């Protein structure tokens, strides 16, 4: 029998589809406000780069006193700026280790509520940094908002995945990525010089991140806790029943609870795993490797190099209005995330991920060719725009949304929090490497920098083709049980796997 309230067998063997209730909509919307902040703080640092660097220089001059001040050395300015960008990822790396602990201790909903303290503190520090003439405050604020985003990157997919019906789990899981890209787009638009990207208003631009945090603080108390957490982890049948009634809109949820009881009995043989226990578990080795590689495929694809440095990339490519081209990329980003929302339950996770990786690889090669020929063929600047827009579009078809929620699908309730922590750490570590190192690698490799990403994308495509299963339409229990019945990834003969052969139809289907 399928586990969880997501899929419930009917008398004729066909599972009825749970309707979308107002409570479910409110809960998902409230949760993904955190993802909106995550995206906003990825994109907000890009457009005002020059005015923030000017502020850094003014602070540097002011600290030297009136006698013989000299401008900040270019190397020091580059390091300060790279740190301002990349410290966001350091915060995410550190906090991602706490996802499992906090989500088990406080619960999914309360953990998201408490997490907003970091968002308010980080946003306040960034907003007041210029008035205090302190680039250290801005860097600390970026660190705190990164720590907030690190927790969000695990808590939101976990919560949404546990409250979503099976037939909508992919689409609702993709809303996490949609909120991220909308946040990026909002930051890019507000960062224009005609709006908040000015020498006097950039602190307001960075500080606005406190607004969605405050809205989430208002809305989340009206949302139910995950019934899976309440019943399976906390053994609270009454609150779990109440939560299920609100989420499903059904007066009788006894069938759902029966399935949760069945899953709980199975999980009593599989206690919640600590991080070290998960890393040492042969049973979970295969899904863990898949989860980590999928996270690496997202970050090492080069997408955040485009988000962090898109304006300077367009300038290098000879685009006349790079800020507007960057916003164009943000619009493409949002539109194709919506496409992914519509396709993920039809085409499946694996197919979309493969399509996205292949398309990004082709666009990275096209971008390299355009940059190489730019001096001889000025029209190549338009080709570079098409290449970056295509790069972003294919990212949002697959590598953008798929890795986050597929990790939650690959693990049962016991190891899921620890698995989200490992996946989050992998994602944030690679994010930090790109954020800190891309500027230096781009200077060293010149037009060939995107060729490096093309090679990585090809490697991730091959891994996905050979090893990543299709999870569409499967319950958490089915997917987890399938991995328990197969040998470790390291012990298997390498062969293409369009769908795990042991993920056959449930006998009640």
UniProtKB/Swiss-Prot annotation:
Its main location: membrane. Interacts with NDUFA9. Binds to DAXX. Interacts via its N-terminus with SRFBP1. Interacts with TRARG1; the interaction is required for proper SLC2A4 recycling after insulin stimulation. A motif (Dileucine internalization motif) lies at residues 489-490. It is linked to Type 2 diabetes mellitus: A multifactorial disorder of glucose homeostasis caused by a lack of sensitivity to insulin. Affected individuals usually have an obese body habitus and manifestations of a metabolic syndrome characterized by diabetes, insulin resistance, hypertension and hypertriglyceridemia. The disease results in long-term complications that affect the eyes, kidneys, nerves, and blood vessels. The dileucine internalization motif is critical for intracellular sequestration. Changing residue 223 to S: Loss of palmitoylation. This is Solute carrier family 2, facilitated glucose transporter member 4. It is found in: Cell membrane; Endomembrane system; Cytoplasm, Perinuclear region. Residues 1-24, 103-111, 164-171, 223-287, 345-353, 406-417, 467-509 are cytoplasmic. The modification Phosphothreonine is found at residue 486. GO terms for molecular function: D-glucose transmembrane transporter activity; D-glucose uniporter activity. Residues 46-81, 133-142, 193-201, 309-323, 375-384, 439-445 are extracellular. Skeletal and cardiac muscles; brown and white fat. It is a multi-pass membrane protein. A lipid is attached at residue 223 (S-palmitoyl cysteine). Residues 7-13 are annotated as: Interaction with SRFBP1. It comes from Homo sapiens (Human). D-glucose binds at residues 177, 298-299, 304, 333, 396, 404. One of its GO terms (biological process) is D-glucose transmembrane transport. Insulin-stimulated phosphorylation of TBC1D4 is required for GLUT4 translocation.
């Amino acid at each position: 029998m399928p586990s969880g309230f997501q899929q419930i067998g009917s008398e004729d063997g066909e599972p009825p589809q749970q309707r979308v209730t107002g409570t479910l909509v409110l809960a998902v919307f409230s949760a993904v406000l955190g993802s909106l902040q995550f995206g906003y703080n990825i994109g907000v640092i890009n457009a005002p780069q020059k005015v923030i660097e000017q502020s850094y220089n003014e602070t540097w001059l002011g600290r030297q006193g009136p006698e013989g001040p000299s401008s900040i050395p270019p190397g020091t300015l580059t390091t300060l700026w790279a740190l301002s960008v990349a410290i966001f990822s350091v915060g995410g790396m550190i906090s991602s280790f706490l996802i499992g602990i906090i989500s088990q201790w406080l619960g999914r909903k309360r953990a998201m509520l408490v997490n907003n303290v970091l968002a308010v503190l980080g946003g306040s520090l960034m907003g007041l940094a210029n008035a205090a003439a302190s680039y250290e405050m801005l860097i600390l604020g970026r660190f705190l908002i990164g720590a907030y985003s690190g927790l969000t990157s695990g808590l939101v997919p976990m919560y949404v995945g546990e409250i979503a019906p099976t037939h909508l789990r992919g689409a609702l899981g993709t809303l996490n990525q949609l909120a991220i890209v909308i946040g990026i787009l909002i930051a890019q638009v507000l960062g224009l010089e005609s709006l908040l990207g000015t020498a006097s208003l950039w602190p307001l631009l960075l500080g606005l991140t406190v607004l969605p945090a405050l809205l989430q603080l208002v809305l989340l108390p009206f949302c139910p806790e995950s019934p899976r957490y309440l019943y399976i982890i906390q053994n609270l049948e009454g609150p779990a029943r109440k939560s299920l009634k609100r989420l499903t809109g059904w007066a009788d949820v006894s069938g759902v609870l029966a399935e949760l009881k069945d899953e709980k009995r199975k999980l009593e043989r599989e206690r919640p795993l600590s991080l070290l226990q998960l890393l040492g578990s042969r049973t979970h080795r295969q899904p863990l490797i898949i989860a980590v590689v999928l996270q690496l495929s997202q970050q090492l694809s080069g997408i955040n190099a485009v988000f962090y440095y898109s304006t300077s990339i367009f300038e290098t490519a000879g685009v006349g209005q790079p800020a507007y081209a960057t916003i164009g990329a943000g619009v493409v980003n949002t539109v194709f995330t919506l496409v992914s929302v519509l396709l993920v339950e039809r085409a499946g996770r694996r197919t979309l991920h493969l399509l996205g990786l292949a398309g990004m690889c082709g666009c990275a090669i096209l971008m390299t060719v355009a940059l190489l020929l730019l001096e001889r063929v000025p029209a190549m600047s338009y080709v570079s725009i098409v290449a970056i827009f295509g790069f972003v579009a294919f990212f949002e078809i697959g590598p953008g949304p798929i890795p986050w929620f597929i990790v939650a699908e690959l693990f049962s309730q016991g190891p899921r929090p620890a698995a989200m922590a490992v996946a989050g750490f992998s994602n944030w570590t690679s994010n930090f490497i790109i954020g800190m190192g891309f500027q230096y690698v781009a200077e060293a490799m010149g037009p060939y920098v995107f060729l490096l990403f093309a090679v990585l994308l090809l490697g991730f495509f091959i891994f996905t083709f050979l090893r990543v299963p299709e999870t569409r339409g499967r319950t958490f229990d089915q997917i987890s049980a399938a991995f328990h019945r197969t040998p470790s990834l390291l012990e298997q003969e390498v062969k293409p796997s369009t769908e795990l052969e042991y993920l056959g139809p449930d006998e009640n289907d």
